Amino acid sequence: MTEKERLLKALAGKAVDRPPFICPGGMMTMIVTEVMDAVECFWPQAHADARKMAELTLGANRLTGIENLGLPFCMTVEAEAMGAEVGLGSRESEPHVTAYAMESLADIDRLTSIDVTKGRARVCTDAVRILKEQAPEVPIIANLSGPVSLATSLVDPLLYYRALHRGKEAAHRLNRLSMKNALAFGDALVEAGADVICIADPSATGELIGRRAFEEFVLPYLNEMTEHFRQRHGKPSIVHICGDVKSLGTVLEQLTAESVSVDAVVGIPLLKALASGKVTMGNISTYLLELGDPEKLARVSEQCLSQGVDILAPACGISPRTPINNILAVSETACRYRTMA
C-alpha cells in the first residue's frame, strides 16, 4: 500500500494495513532545520521559490518518515494576497503578518482578491506540480487558512472578536470574503495536483469564542469549504481546531470534513467521543517532539495508536528545532503497529 493509498483510504474510513503518520503543513508545518541542512534548502528563501519549496517538503518526507507532502509552510499566503503585509521570518521562524490590511471591519473594501497566478500563491501551485511529477505515490496536502484565522490576519483580532457580539453582519461579511479567497487558493492547489485539503482555524477555538459563536461564525463556513472540495473536486478534507474543544461539546460531529484534528490537550478518547463518526487525527505533543527523547515519543505514539487514533500526527505541527530522530521514533512506531495490534 502506497503512502497516498493509505492516507486516502484512512480518510474514507476504509480498512488500512496501519494508521498513516502525517504532518499536513501550513500552521502544522513538517519542516525542521536538520532537513534544511540535509537538502540545502532553507527558510525563508523556500517560502518564495517553488523548486526550493518542493525540494524541502520532499526532503522532509524522505528523511523523517512523515508520509505526506505539505505546503505552504505557513498561514499567511491568503492574507498577503488580500493586502496584509507579511514578513517571511527566518531559518527558525515562520512567515507572519506584520501589518493588517484593515484598520477596522468597515475597511473591507480595501481588501484585494487573491490572484493565484502571482506571488506566493503561484509559488505554491508551481511547487505542487513539481511534487506531483517527482513523487506521485506520496499524498500532497494543500493547506488553507480557516475563515476566522484569515479574518484575524486581516484586521486586529480584538476588533473581530468584538464584532462577533456587536457587529455580526460585518463579521459575517469578512468571513464570507475570507472563505471565498481561501477557496480560490484551494481550487488552484487541487487543480495543480493536491490530493487532500487541510483547513486550520486556530483562531476559532472554543476557549476564545465559545460554542454559540462557533456554531454561527465557524461551523457553516468550514462546512461550506469542505463540501466545496468534496463536490467540485472529489477531495477529502481535514479540519484542525486548536485549544481545548471540550467547551464545544459534540458540535464537532456537525463538521462535514472527513477528519478532525485537535490540540494535544485533548486526548484521543475524548476526541473520539466529541467527534463521533469522524476520522480522528493526532495527537503527539509538538513540545514533546522538540524537547523529548525517542523512547518517550515511541511510548506516546504507541499509546495514541492503542487508543484508536485513525491518523497519527503531531497535534499542532513540528517546531523547526525538532530533532529528526524524534520524528523517526514516531514514524517507526506507526510502521510497527500492524505487527503490534
List the model feature ranges, each with a label:
Residues M53, T57, E78, S104-D107, ...:
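Generic hydrophobic, aliphatic-rich segments that mediate packing or membrane embedding
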Residues L56-V77:
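N-terminal low-complexity or amphipathic/hydrophobic leaders
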Residues L71-I114, E137:
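A contiguous, low-structure linker/loop signature
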Residues M28, T33-L63:
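Active-site-flanking structural segment that lines cofactor/substrate pockets
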Residues H47-A48, F73, C242:
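Active-site nucleophile and cofactor-binding loops and adjacent substrate-binding regions
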Residues E3-I31, M36-V39, E67, G89-V97, ...:
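Active-site loop segments of alpha/beta catalytic cores
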